[in-house]
Amino acid sequence: MPHNSMLKENRLFKPTDEFRRQANISGLETYQALWEFADKDYLTYWSDLARELITWKKPFMHIFDDSEAPFYKWFSDGTLNVSYNCLDRHLPDKADKTALIFESDFGQVQLYTYAKLHNRVCRFANALRELGIKKGDRVIIYLPMLVEAVIAMQACARIGAVHSVVFGGFSASALRDRIEDAEAKLVITANAGLRGGKIIPLKETVDEALEMGCKTIENVIVFHRVNIDTPWKKGRDLWWNELTANQPAFCEPEWMNAEDPLFILYTSGSTGKPKGIVHSTGGYLLGALNSFRNVFDNKPNDIFWCTADVGWITGHSYVCYGPLANGATQVIFEGVPTYPDPGRIWRMIQRHKINVFYTSPTLIRSLTRLGDHIPNKYDLSSLRLLGSVGEPINPSAWMWFYEVVGKSRCPIVDTWWQTETGSIMLAPIPGVTATKPGSCTLPLPGIMAEVLDENGQKCAVEQGGALAIKRPFPSMLRTIWNDPERYKSTYFPAEYGGKYYIAGDNAHRDKDGYFWILGRTDDVLNVSGHRLGTMEIESALVASPKVAEAAVVGKPDEIKGEAIVAFVVLNDFRPEGEEARQLAEELKAWVSNEIGKIARPEDIRFADNLPKTRSGKIMRRLLRSIAKNEMITQDISTLENPQIIGQLQQQWL
């Protein structure tokens, strides 16, 4: 069956004998024993792993504390340092091992050994301390995909500062919101970034954000990436290289309590205000470390490449922390996968002899459209394992990845997890689990996942329901920054008894117990693996002086997974024809400027008003059907203004 016509694929794909023979976990009996042990003696399972995998300054005695549930604590009397676990402990036997292979936008390659990376992290950490940054202070990192982003994150972890990385594609107002919520003291940025041959003026965006408020910011550290004129505020702005030039090459780690915050990462919420997800030091590190080792079957000589930006959780767990804590070698790429030509990504795999390749369904789908002949021109024989992250992967893209890229010999680990979970929750163990295209298969040992109906009962086979995790796990978020009540109501809702972690995704299980993710239950869109709140986009549209009202929904998109459709009511008229097309383009650019290009609507439609019930509630379900060009089958008897349906169906592309 050709890849492009496949809607469902029912075959099971078992790991090859060759892969299974060398896998870290290979026997079904071994895997089942591990799973049963985790199920029966849950706390011993996690405490054994924590003692085996993490280097502790002060070993923990207390494994788990649920006395303030759902604010759970793990290993709470132990002390450690994440940077020490990622760098220092490898120096006795891995000082000269390559930690990072950096490839720039224009193809220049730089290697960083563990010793060199340790040196750079320590120098930068000492510079931060010299500026008065101390344990618990919040630091915003707004950098391109450079080694310096990892250095900045590790340096914060080393001195106990709480970093909050903001994706470099976010706008000044989005950056300001995050700075103000975190009450950060410092911003770390670059004068500009390079992507696809284009210069991205990051420092200008930082300046614009700080002009809007952000009174807590004392300094801005600027890495010189591009030779351009850089706007400068004397007394506040400092050059990275000047700060670090004379710093000592060792920085004593700050020994942190396991429950101290490691970082805040903002993720979109359905109410419009981004949620500051707080991750702990000990539990988060254990999750990233253990999942990297098992899901990616980590080997001492592997070259690993995760294409995620560090502005997202995948870049935290499987670029900055998981690989380095395991002493692995990985690639960091500054540029765009199809620049300067469509073969870039495959040429990099050939050039660096990459063994494990972890990327998003959006990228896979965009590469399939370019044709099989492009990857077939390159030697991809170094690959032994492929991975997918960020959204469900459709079976046709899975099969293309498996057959064309992996030559039907590389297992695919389709992983489900979230910013909030910190590490992978559901995924195949590649030497054991038979895979099904489109399914993230089974929970990892120690993760007790289930699909629940609206009464909190286990769903029947193939019945859709809410994906839940029934027991706390070490890498889960600890709270929402400055909003503990929102944490409780969002993740431990009363309708499920307040005791289960409710992921906000719908799923079902098949007859083999495999999980299939069906999509978001709330008003959060998943665009190219990035979560965007509908309320945030609606707020941006309404901020335009021309817009009176807006409603945003998603529709399926074969490249992005989900595309943004906006229904807009203007202040005084409804445009048609060329005028509507021009206004739609203007509003798309407006949203890009307000939030970032990732939030640019694919389709904007104009109406005299929005479909509302007589109580004034917008009928979003109806809008979703219209966006998908579906026949309207739902009950519209409560619709106050049925005459506008025809207007809402008109596209001005």
Curated annotation (Swiss-Prot):
Entry EC number(s): 6.2.1.1
Record-listed ATP binding positions: 390-392, 414-419, 505, 520, 531
Post-translational events: Acetylated. Deacetylation by the SIR2-homolog deacetylase activates the enzyme.
Protein keywords: Acetylation, ATP-binding, Ligase, Magnesium, Metal-binding, Nucleotide-binding
Protein family membership: Belongs to the ATP-dependent AMP-binding enzyme family.
Binding residues for CoA: 195-198, 314, 528
Domain of life per record: Bacteria
Cofactor: Mg(2+)
UniProt xrefs under PANTHER family: ACETYL-COENZYME A SYNTHETASE (PTHR24095), ACETYL-COENZYME A SYNTHETASE 1 (PTHR24095:SF14)
Species per Swiss-Prot/TrEMBL record: Pasteurella multocida (strain Pm70)
Lineage: Bacteria, Pseudomonadati, Pseudomonadota, Gammaproteobacteria, Pasteurellales
Modified-residue entries (N6-acetyllysine), positions: 617
Binding-site positions, Mg(2+): 542, 547
Official protein name in the record: Acetyl-coenzyme A synthetase
InterPro entries: Ac_CoA_lig, ACAS_N, AMP-bd_C, AMP-bd_C_sf, AMP-binding_CS, AMP-dep_synth/lig_dom, ANL_N_sf, Pept_S26A_signal_pept_1_CS
Pfam family, one: AMP-binding
Enzyme class: ligase
Cross-referenced PROSITE patterns: AMP_BINDING (PS00455)
GO CC terms: cytosol; membrane
